[in-house]
Amino acid sequence: MAAKEVKFGSDARAKMLRGVDILADAVKVTLGPKGRNVVIEKSFGAPRITKDGVTVAKEIELSDKFENMGAQMVKEVAQKTADLAGDGTTTATVLAQAIVREGAKAIAAGMNPMDVKRGVDVAVQTVVDDIKSRSRKVTTNDEIAQVGTISANGEAEIGKMIAEAMQKVGNEGVITVEEAKALETELDVVEGMQFDRGYLSPYFVTNADKMVAELESPYILLFEKKLSGLQAMLPVLEAVVQSSRPLLIVAEDVEGEALATLVVNKLRGGLKVAAVKAPGFGDRRKAMLEDMAILTGGQVVSEDLGIKLENVSLEMLGQAKKVVITKDNTTIVDGAGSKEDIQARIVQIKAQIEETTSDYDREKLQERLAKLAGGVAVIRVGGATEVEVKERKDRVDDAMHATRAAVEEGIVAGGGVALLYATKALDKLTAVNEDQKFGIDIVRKALQAPVRQIAQNAGFDGSVIVGKLLEKGETNFGFNAQAGEYGDMFKFGVIDPTKVVRAALQDAASVAGLLITTEAMIGEKPEKKAPAGAPGGMGGMGDMDF
């Protein structure tokens, strides 16, 4: 086992604090509407430019291992806040740095670290309760757009686009962000259920110019096995022909004779038909077919359920207003399933999302939920150069997470104001002893840090602004750094999601509390490599053969 290097007490804390400061100082320049960019070197290609706190934090790795431990702990704060709320990572980093700094001073002055930490914990819980009590529900589309705009660094176009996407796909719908090849940023909304399987044969196409198959008010047959012959299907095919409506077949696969027969019938005009493979694999495929059945008001033809192809009637088939099939995707628009059944299925999938421990499964379940509940919106981010597109995509991602958080837990006054005024709630707290009281004071001081930093990044004096706001004492009164003026933050449209503010403080205090109570640090001792031996001299040439 390699030898270890151990540091104790103030030595350990000084090193750790240095690491915290390096990381936090790099991250906090990005805070606020006038925050600056950070340029990150990449091992290949152009450097990356970003204003996203967690992206900056992830890139920082220090050469001194003890300093690096401090930096990695604060990186954890940013990462945790990003995972939980999707935004607020820079605020969390600024708060963590402020709590650690003040905490280190308290410990150096001889206070009991555990009591100081208890004081911090009590204060944080009080502040969180206070912020929640002042939270307002998001009621209008404009408020959603404002939250998005603030998170996208004042770019109103992004805020509006996200609000529009959320309006179209609903709160359960999925909004994805992709890089576009064009200059413009655009929104593309797919209503209904879309899955990534296209037509099995180009002969199914109904619109040759666009190479798509469009079926108006079709019947939909959902079959979980492979279709290799059509003999068993003849009764249902005849019934569909009688009804003069098109048919979509979704099966594990349609091969050989079955596919050839369908294509021939389609070309002769006897039967308007298209066939696609079912999405997913294994159990997930079964679940997705079941989703489609509920959405379209049909049944999955499955031998597990005792249903055979020969016995299928028209009533067992699903129906939809329209189905559009391209070579890569199939979209079912306006399925005929009952609202109650769809709602029950949504509740069931939500329960599975709560229970699952796998991130991959959770992601897939959320996709299924979105397809059932509303649809999928894609924001394609454009720009003049690849660097610009990547920078903007970071901001759109942040804005999207922030708006989701706002819908979930409501909104509070932005610009660090909600945290600043929460200091009033701390006045009512009574501490058990002096050290705990100091812990409460640490949080009181730290809550001023975001407002100070936002003002500083905008070129104003943070202390003066904090003083003015506390003097005024109105909970929504703040400083709009973008315009350089004081006023009601809600009227300015400067608002933050409650969830983001809460998560930033809780995550910052959690890690900062651990750093304050650290008394020893253990790191690998670098092994000294033995110096390379001197090269041997030239040998004589006596043994050479000629």
UniProtKB/Swiss-Prot annotation:
UniProt enzyme class: isomerase
Region (Disordered): 527-546
GO MF term set: ATP binding; ATP-dependent protein folding chaperone; isomerase activity; unfolded protein binding
Domain of life: Bacteria
Binding site for ATP: 30-33, 51, 87-91, 415, 496
Reaction equations catalysed: ATP + H2O + a folded polypeptide = ADP + phosphate + an unfolded polypeptide
Amino acid composition bias (Gly residues), ranges on this chain: 534-546
Protein location: Cytoplasm
Signal peptide boundaries: none
Key words, A-Z: ATP-binding, Chaperone, Cytoplasm, Isomerase, Nucleotide-binding
UniProt entry tagged with the keyword Isomerase: yes
A GO BP annotation: protein refolding
Function noted in UniProt: Together with its co-chaperonin GroES, plays an essential role in assisting protein folding. The GroEL-GroES system forms a nano-cage that allows encapsulation of the non-native substrate proteins and provides a physical environment optimized to promote and accelerate protein folding.
PANTHER family for the chain: 60 KDA HEAT SHOCK PROTEIN, MITOCHONDRIAL
Family, similarity comment: Belongs to the chaperonin (HSP60) family.
Name of protein: Chaperonin GroEL
Organism: Rhodospirillum centenum (strain ATCC 51521 / SW)
